């Protein structure tokens, strides 16, 4: 935490508005507490937070609204099928925003483009993105991209 106490004010000086933590073993009490301390410190420094990996949302973002979203979901980086995805709004999403990792054009997907387009709307996250493993250059000719832009 000592490094973050020095780093977070520096990030603000540089104009950075948020950080994404990742690859922390959140399952233990020790690391969950460490992560919550990080969110508090980010709030003190007016930084937004996005938690990566298997963190389980517990309502902490109600106290610290700078915690905009957290993964804690089997998103497209795991290439789930449509059956998995249609259960998420009724299971994982009841615990708050989810950083799902939409992979709109990835050829390994087991769903359609229409499914991905709908998922980006149904799966709530203030930091929604549409190209995780994709390249932005793939998107310039697709008419539905106007919907994402607006």
Can you name each region flagged by the protein language model?
Residues 134-150:
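Glycan-recognition and catalytic regions of carbohydrate-active enzymes
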Residues 100-139:
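Charge-patterned, long linear interaction tracts outside catalytic cores
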Residues 1-112:
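Aromatic- and carboxylate-enriched substrate-binding clefts and catalytic-loop regions
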